[in-house]
Amino acid sequence: MKKALIVGLNNYPGCALEWCNNDAIAMKELIESNGDGSPNFDVVPIIDNCSKNDLTLAIGKLFADDADIALLYFSGHGADLDGGYLCTTDFSKSDYGVKMTDVLEMANKSRCKNKVIILDCCFAAKMGESILLNNNSVLGEGVTIIAASQSWQTSEEKRSIQHGIFTELLIQGLKGGAADIGGNITPASLYSFVDQSLGAWQQRPVFKTNISQFLPL
């Protein structure tokens, strides 16, 4: 079983984004079925608005069972305080949303075989940078993170493509640009495609993993 939580948040009070909902809708449509029309991921979408409580519950549910692949995709604002946040649309100056460390803890504890976290937000590579836990690797077995930008960088949207730059390349990769000779796409091949496609662009993606064998997306 493959399951995914696809999140695209635009409606931030005072700092709205334009294309995160487009990002999420496109990602949902791409991964919920294979090229031949057969089912692929069981997708739960969250579009435009989401509270901290609702996002926390949804992420917990995503990682709660023993799926072959559990994929979290987030497009929205990120904050670089306290190890990083996935900002929710009910954010405040005292609470920006869901802590990246909390997301990673849920993924690390999950019994799912492959846990893939894809973040198209500013400071995305903050995910996985926290202090080592109990002298073990920050990334638990089976966890992979693909981040749109370095931990000190912003992630850009582009009006001409009506997507985030990072997600636009993810879309191209999932449409076949990142496929191997057998037509399979893995998190590693997807990252490689995005990284090479960005060329000299200032925003640099980041790939972190602790896995012995990838399952195709």
PLM feature segments, named:
Residues 1-217:
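Cysteine endopeptidase catalytic domains of the caspase/legumain-like
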